[in-house]
Amino acid sequence: PIKGISSLGSVSLLHIQSNNGKSIGEIAARIFDILSRSDIEILLITQASHEQSLSIAVNNHQAQKAKIAIEKDFVLELKVEQMLPILIEENLSIVAIVGRQMKGVPGISGKLFSVLGNNKINIVAIAQGSSELNVSAVINSKDETKALRAIHKEFFKTIDESINLFLVGTGLIGATLLKQINESSISIRLCGLANDQLML
């Protein structure tokens, strides 16, 4: 069911939390309207299980604008502490696996999160599209490339992951090259060796 992997960098998360015991869902529509009127694109939305907090992903350059717009509209709620101060978490990236009917395939989301965890990549937030077409994870931008490689390796394994190698030169340079390849965990198939006196 997995058809591809996507990523988006330069992302910030706005953390919004209700402090009056009411579900954040009751004010979510108001927040979305504020951001829409401010021409701020919402990239991802995730809600905490206790339903009193909401995290919204926006582009880095729009994060402060979004925070100010929400604070302006909720000035009373913030003043009487019915809403906690809005926090911004910057320098994030969104990585996602894309496919069809993924909800009906057990273990897809868990597999994604396990891959990230096994590679020591911290997950800041997660979201699954209602259309069942994608599962997304928000991570630190510094881990974006590492995450994409790990996800691709896990979900798009090939039958033969080795490369053919014909090594010309068996001295220090050749030995160093083989050592570097070995340390990178790349599987190689040595097809031949040659130096200035012999070819095998």
Model-derived regions, located:
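A conserved regulatory-domain signal marking ACT and ACT-like small-molecule sensing domains
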Residues: 1-179
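NAD(P)-binding Rossmann-fold cofactor-contacting core
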Residues: 185-200
